[in-house]
């Protein structure tokens, strides 16, 4: 990881530079950087609403990033040690649904833990995917479910060689991490 490069905040820096241009907004959002909604300014603060602008050329485009958003995604991937990272505006739900809908079709099997978020179930309903559940163990003392066990994932893959994806909650809602590196290696084998 390039620690010096990680000090950059390309989207924020572009928003600050754009703000200094004193562009008069005639598009969305309707609060017009707070001038159209003083209550919003009181609630969120001037700094927040002054940077809430539409996607204009110097601010890049999330659907086809080529400048500051692309750089931010590259920085995120570098920070997480990932091959790629994608910024989403619809939260985790839209990210999860995008992942599943882009990989699974009707009848496709997807290996996943039983304790997934409802967004996963919703995406499977939308595309017609078939779940292959790997039940997580429970920590009886704490009363919480644990991560996916590598051996159970391996068995699910062996039992379902036609599965098109493995979905992992990592970390779980309780902060438990699975051995994601080994699970990824199994899935890609």
What are these model-derived regions, one by one?
Residues 115-118, 135-141:
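Short, acidic/turn-prone active-site loops that include or flank metal/cofactor-
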Residues 112-131:
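Substrate-binding/gating loop at the entrance of the active-site cleft, primarily
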Residues 84-110, 123:
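Conserved beta-loop-alpha segment that forms the PLP phosphate-binding cup at the N-terminus of a helix
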Residues 142-189:
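Active-site phosphate-binding strand-loop segment of PLP-dependent enzymes
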Residues 69, 90-95, 116-118, 172-176:
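Gly/Ser/Thr-rich loops at beta-strand to alpha-helix junctions
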Residues 46-94:
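Conserved N-terminal alpha-helix of the aminotransferase class I/II PLP-enzyme fold
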